[in-house]
Structures are given as structure tokens and as C-alpha cells.
Amino acid sequence: MNNKTKKNKTITQVYTQPIYCIKQVIVVVSNDMNSLKKYIDKSIDLNRYTNADGLTFNNVTYKNKSSVCIYLRPSEFSDSVDNVAAHESFHAASAILDCAGVKLCSNSEEAFAYLVGWINECVMKTYYKWLKK
């Protein structure tokens, strides 16, 4: 299956993060950036991000819960999906831990590492669902 066949396909997953003040991680995997409009502030101009392979939006409220939203523009043929997923996972983890008052330092590396790993796993699970659809 080529990218033209999958062009308008969107997979969205909402993952619960029960430990910190931001309770949800929303992952949107789509070639259509407009699929983000349901989750992000209406004032955000998505045209500014047309070349982005990934984005993370903080301060998102979805179903009355504080959330972060990660967008991944997928490609079946790209070697960079893992890198983009890890990059955006770090941004999301930083937002979540910042909300909890945890700053990145040698004493907080484990908290960051575990949270980045968990978020990256969520992003990749959603991406693999996109590939299979």
C-alpha cells in the first residue's frame, strides 16, 4: 500500500497517565493536520507547521482533563519516525513534569527517562495501528 492510499487515514489514541497533574496523552497519527483541530486551541494556526513531521501541544483540555497532544505525520518509508516519536515524547514528558514542578536535573533523570519511554511507547503503538489500518 502506498502513501496515496493512506493519505487521509487518521488514528487517534488517548492514553491515561495517572501519576502527574497532566492526566492524558493524546496521540494523533495522520497526514492530515486538520485532524488536530478537535484537540488543540482554535487560535493555533496549523499553517505555521505544514513542514513538521511531529508536534507537541501543551495545555490541552480534552474531556475535562488536562492533556498533552502529540501529532506524528507518518510515512511507511521514513527512517525518522522513531526519532520524531522520541523527540515529541521528550517535549510531552517535559510539559507533564514541569506541571508537577519537576525540573530536569541529575536527581530527576529517572522520572524523565521512565515517562519519556512510556510516552514513546504510546506514540509507537499508535503509529503501528496506523500502519495496519
Per-segment meaning from a language model:
Residues 1-35, 67-69, 105, 128-129, ...:
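N-terminal low-structure segments adjacent to metalloprotease catalytic domains
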Residues 76-80, 104-107:
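Short coil/turn segments at secondary-structure boundaries
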Residues 80-89:
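Short alpha-helical catalytic segment bearing the HExxH-like zincin motif
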Residues 37-79, 92-95:
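Active-site scaffold of zinc-dependent metalloenzymes
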Residues 14-17, 47, 87:
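Compositionally biased, intrinsically disordered low-complexity segments
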